[in-house]
From Swiss-Prot:
InterPro entries: Prenylated_rab_accept_PRA1 (IPR004895). Belongs to the PRA1 family. May be involved in both secretory and endocytic intracellular trafficking in the endosomal/prevacuolar compartments. It is found in: Endosome membrane. Its main location: membrane. GO terms for cellular component: endoplasmic reticulum; endosome membrane. It is a multi-pass membrane protein. Keywords: Endosome, Membrane, Transmembrane, Transmembrane helix, Transport. This is PRA1 family protein B5. The chain crosses the membrane at residues 83-103, 105-125, 146-166, 170-190, 196-216. The gene is PRA1B5. Expressed in roots, lateral roots, lateral root caps, columella cells, leaves, and shoot apex.
């Protein structure tokens, strides 16, 4: 009897499924880093651009320029001029005081970092077309935003974070107020208009002081 080989049956594999899955997973994973990278690059460029417009610290701390104001109105005028001229330096001083205060209170720093990470990864960097899923439950955009707002209120007002932030801000504001009131601005504002229009965090700055050159020329012209 002649033996015949059994017919070869086609065997189906799931190779197509495995080959199609990695690109989908890769696309999902790689869709997040560019957003984070763009955010970090934007913040870095903003900070570096603002710091490049700061005034020399030797000019800020020039001891020969500190004099006692004659009146409260003069102190207010000095502060207004100095805050416009040293706006970037003042922001750096407040930021340094705030940073040292948080470093002195590690628990508050950890809570604040966790809160910031929650806002970044659960709301800002999360795709808007994908709902947030936690513990098997899907949360809508408004539910996520409401939860983050309530968490922020709870962390700031019911923990030590609020007191640390408020005390640091008060110390920083008091420091720049004292400096602005006692620093005589007679030698300042030589090129103020170039810097006031593009200052660091310009939304906290005061409007630029107009130049006195046009008024002086108009006063010198004959009637």
């Amino acid at each position: 009897m002649v033996s015949t080989n059994p017919p070869v049956l086609p065997i189906s594999t799931t190779a197509t499924d495995t080959t199609n899955q990695p690109p989908i997973v890769t696309a999902v994973v790689e869709s997040q880093p560019p957003v984070v990278r763009a955010f970090v690059n934007g913040v870095t460029e903003t900070v570096c651009g603002g710091l490049s417009r700061s005034r020399p610290w030797s000019e800020l701390l020039d001891r020969s320029a500190f004099t006692k104001p004659d009146s409260l109105s003069e102190a207010g005028t000095r502060f207004r001029k100095n805050s416009s001229y040293f706006r970037v330096n003042y922001v750096c001083i407040v930021a340094l005081i705030l940073g040292f205060s948080l470093l002195a209170h590690p628990f508050s720093l950890i809570l604040l970092l966790c809160l910031a990470a929650s806002w970044l990864f659960l709301y800002l960097f999360r795709p808007s077309d994908r709902p947030l899923i936690l513990f098997g439950r899907s949360f809508s955009e408004y539910e996520t935003l409401g939860g983050l707002i309530l968490s922020t209120i709870a962390v700031i007002f019911f923990t030590s974070v609020g007191s640390v932030l408020i005390s640091a801000l008060m110390i920083g504001i008091a420091t720049i107020c004292v400096h602005g009131a006692f620093r005589a601005p007679d030698d300042l504002f030589l090129d103020e208009q170039d810097h006031a229009a593009s200052g660091f965090l310009s939304f906290i700055g005061v409007p630029a002081i107009p130049s006195v050159a046009p008024s002086a020329s108009s006063a010198a012209s004959p009637v």
